[in-house]
Amino acid sequence: MSNWLMLEGDVCAVTGALGGMGTEICREFARNGANVVMLDLDEEKVKAAAAALSEEFGIHAEGYKMNACNEDEVQAAVDATIRDFGRVDVLVNTAGILRFSPMEDLPLSDWNDVINVNLTGTFVASQRFGREMIKAGKGRLVHISTAASYSPETFSGVYSSTKAGVNMLSKMLAAEWGPYGVRSNCVCPCFVKTPMSASFYADPEVEKSRSRLIATRRIGEVTDIANAVMFLASTRSDFTTGAEIMVDGGFSNMMGDLTAKPGGRRAFAENYLKNKGVDLWTDVAGVKTPSDQ
């Protein structure tokens, strides 16, 4: 167990705790001696996951059912946290969903679903847990955003839009709650292996091709994201608030949206346009990428 982060004994709540990224963040908190509040939709599974975490790391972990879009469930989770732990020091918002569609075909129901989970859910959880932090005069909020909140990702417009909203929400919380001792920051991943992106990397050639587009020449792991979250969740980052930290292997500094990204959204875009008789690179971009030559 490392003491450098000084997280030992802190109470750290994580939404979307049963997802690949959320689970690893919970485990990393536990490795550093923090007590963990796991929040997710499946009550039975989240309670079992918390019990396993407690047994493995010897910390206090609890799992509570929580839909971040439901104010009553969020408040119940806050009340349970205060009842069982006495306080909350950290909230990490990882809960999120993704829908692929060209904007002209995106159903309003999909738009509303993604907005509700990714943006409204982040707001409600931050507001309710944040009130307890304001009372205590200290607290740290960390929100999982994406590099696509800066650069458009074709056919993931609603996802990118919500995450851009999360970035601004984080800045507003940082500005308004800073005087109360509460900090708010975002982590912006890209090209990371998670259950949500598993289908992208099922083909080894896709992973190999995508790796060539990244400065570090490898696809990210959930541990890469968890490590960045640990820093922002700790008092080691006490002078950092309202920030967005890119954790993307340098991709966002190297490439724009017209870079070919084999598999996943790019393949979806290429196939969609191909069916309409349009070649993405010659007819739309007017270029051929190195991988096409």
Predicted regions located by residue number:
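Canonical Rossmann dinucleotide-binding motif of NAD(H)/NADP(H)-dependent dehydrogenases/reductases
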Residues: 4-37
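Active-site loop-to-helix junction immediately N-terminal to the catalytic Tyr of the SDR YXXXK motif
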Residues: 98, 106, 152-160, 172, ...
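Substrate-binding pocket helix/loop in short-chain dehydrogenase/reductase
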Residues: 102-103, 110-115, 210
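Active-site helix of classical SDR
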Residues: 126, 162, 170
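Alpha-helical segment proximal to the catalytic Tyr-Lys
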Residues: 131, 175-179, 238
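Residue(s) in the substrate-gating loop at a strand-loop-helix junction
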Residues: 146
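C-terminal helical subdomain
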Residues: 186, 208-240, 245-249, 276-293
